[in-house]
Amino acid sequence: MDNIRNFSIIAHIDHGKSTLADRIIQLCGGLSDREMEAQVLDSMDIEKERGITIKAQTAALSYKARDGKVYNLNLIDTPGHVDFSYEVSRSLSACEGALLVVDASQGVEAQTVANCYTAIELGVEVVPVLNKIDLPAADPDSAIQEIEDVIGIDAQDATRCSAKTGVGVPDVLEALIAKVPAPKGDPDAPLQALIIDSWFDNYVGVVMLVRVVNGTLRAKDKVLLMATGAQHLVEQVGVFSPKSVPRESLSAGQVGFVIAGIKELKAAKVGDTITHVVPRKADAPLPGFKEVKPQVFAGLYPVEANQYEALRESLEKLQLNDASLQFEPEVSQALGFGFRCGFLGLLHMEIVQERLEREFDMDLITTAPTVVYQVMQRDGTTVQVENPAKMPDPSKIESILEPIVTVNLYMPQEYVGAVITLCEQKRGSQINMSYHGRQVQLTYEIPMGEIVLDFFDRLKSVSRGYASMDYEFKEYRPSDVVKVDMLINGDKVDALSIIVHRSNSAYRGREVAAKMREIIPRQMYDVAIQAAIGSNVIARENVKALRKNVLAKCYGGDISRKKKLLEKQKEGKKRMKQVGSVEIPQEAFLAILRVEEK
């Protein structure tokens, strides 16, 4: 056990985490040169393209150090994005050490800090590494200063390397072996193994990635999953080198995979503890397990109504590999049949949409994302509302609570003003502001409903892409939010309802109505577009009727003749308006999303 090192790599997007992992795998001979490809550990295409890691992956490597001993290194690759922060904390709790990779030309970024604090809270030894020192713009000294200022760990002896060229990578491994402690644990104690991640394989069912904390796990053992209470028979255990290599057993301190004939992911929850059924069951599960709750909801509808079943199948297949995705059927008068889906955050939502479109060839319409509001009713009950259409009648509502998130923003000094203005527009309240060299850290509390619409895009545009952010849920607070309904000729259109703060409601109502006016085609009669809160109309636009010139045949002549013709036309229009219904084009729903992006 003294020769095992479990570690993960913490880095911001594009700071070279996956490349460094590739180099380490190559150096330790985990894959032959023929099998080596860029970003070995990112298995989904979308991970490679966006350069992000979504699912955790591992590699068990052996490395002969300069002191002549052979060490077993277990690299656990973690997602870097805030939406997947629970997966990150589980991956980190399976390690004793973490390499903090910082781009020497860019310095510290927000997500690095968020994940680094998670690591420090979990008692993981953080080893700073400066990457990309081969770049002409690299400034290692100021990067070291930033690590010390922002994160507060000693970085004077940070290892310098370039993952692209391979310079300094052996030094990184030596530093890792020297600084990271060996795992503690008793191979003879009752079994406790932490599920770091799980995914679905078409041939063997669910594959669980585990870190054995105490005890030994062998094939043919009967095991119990403590959170669900389900029992399974282990079929196979082994390690990834990144290829899967079966082993006879996994003992304390090791990281590997377990296949136990589980059919669905819901049964193997990330963060759960595996123990033996007989003869010795562990007394308590490992700490830190929690159910992941979706934070952002949106409706997904197929463009073609006959694609509904196909969309259901696609979502079910995605759910096999992504237990945090939730969905339930939903019917909208305007868009037909679809699903209300729950996501961990905005990035998660984009990834799910992109995977549906790319891997399953679906054409989708997405409604505006919303968050979960808690509505206290007059009769003392509380309801959770994640869909504007389900908001109770205003007369029954006592108060509405909205989720507030704490947002940490990092940006160069020159963009502070623009970012503060943006946060104020989004009803944020400033908590803290501190300077670290050229970088500024701002902490705000902002309602989550304001974040999910377009905060991230706007932040990137006001700071020319230099600002980075991460957010975490803080609490629910009472807020004066209202539901704005859109009426067309007096009929409510459910899919266009939005929940906004009262102070912003008139502006948003006007914007949406104006946008709809451009999009709805002219009819033979006037079409009234109204935005209303309850029965109170706050904005109105008219789409003018198309009319035929009925006076064209009267050359001169008597006024009463003209009046008669005009009256007759008016009568006809009135009758039409009673029976006619306005078709709302699909673009209108997308327009609502566009309004929010302005």
Curated annotation (Swiss-Prot):
Keyword check for Cell inner membrane, yes or no. yes
Recorded catalytic reaction(s): these are:
GTP + H2O = GDP + phosphate + H(+)
The main location class comes to: membrane
Kindly list the GO molecular function terms attached to this UniProt entry. GTP binding; GTPase activity; guanosine tetraphosphate binding; ribosome binding; translation elongation factor activity
Q: Which GO terms describe its biological process?
A: positive regulation of translation
Q: Where does GTP bind?
A: D14, H15, G16, K17, S18, T19, N131, K132, I133, D134
Q: What is its EC number?
A: 3.6.5.n1
Give the signal peptide as a residue range, or say none if absent.
none
| Keywords from the UniProt entry | Cell inner membrane, Cell membrane, GTP-binding, Hydrolase, Membrane, Nucleotide-binding, Protein biosynthesis
Gene3D superfamilies documented for this protein: 3.30.70.240, Elongation factor 4, C-terminal domain, Elongation Factor G (Translational Gtpase), domain 3, P-loop containing nucleotide triphosphate hydrolases, Translation factors
Ligase keyword on record: no
Compartment(s) where it occurs, according to its Swiss-Prot or TrEMBL record:
Cell inner membrane
**Cross-referenced Pfam families:** EFG_C (PF00679), GTP_EFTU (PF00009), GTP_EFTU_D2 (PF03144), LepA_C (PF06421)
Q: How does the protein associate with the membrane?
A: Peripheral membrane protein
Q: GO cellular component terms?
A: plasma membrane
Q: Where is the tr-type G domain?
A: 2-184
Fetch the SUPFAM superfamilies from UniProt.
EF-G C-terminal domain-like, P-loop containing nucleoside triphosphate hydrolases
Taxonomically, which superkingdom?
Answer: Bacteria
Q: Which PANTHER family match?
A: TRANSLATION FACTOR GUF1 HOMOLOG, CHLOROPLASTIC, TRANSLATION FACTOR GUF1-RELATED
- Its function? Required for accurate and efficient protein synthesis under certain stress conditions. May act as a fidelity factor of the translation reaction, by catalyzing a one-codon backward translocation of tRNAs on improperly translocated ribosomes. Back-translocation proceeds from a post-translocation (POST) complex to a pre-translocation (PRE) complex, thus giving elongation factor G a second chance to translocate the tRNAs correctly. Binds to ribosomes in a GTP-dependent manner.
Q: Which family does the entry's similarity section mention?
A: Belongs to the TRAFAC class translation factor GTPase superfamily. Classic translation factor GTPase family. LepA subfamily.
Q: What is this protein called?
A: Elongation factor 4
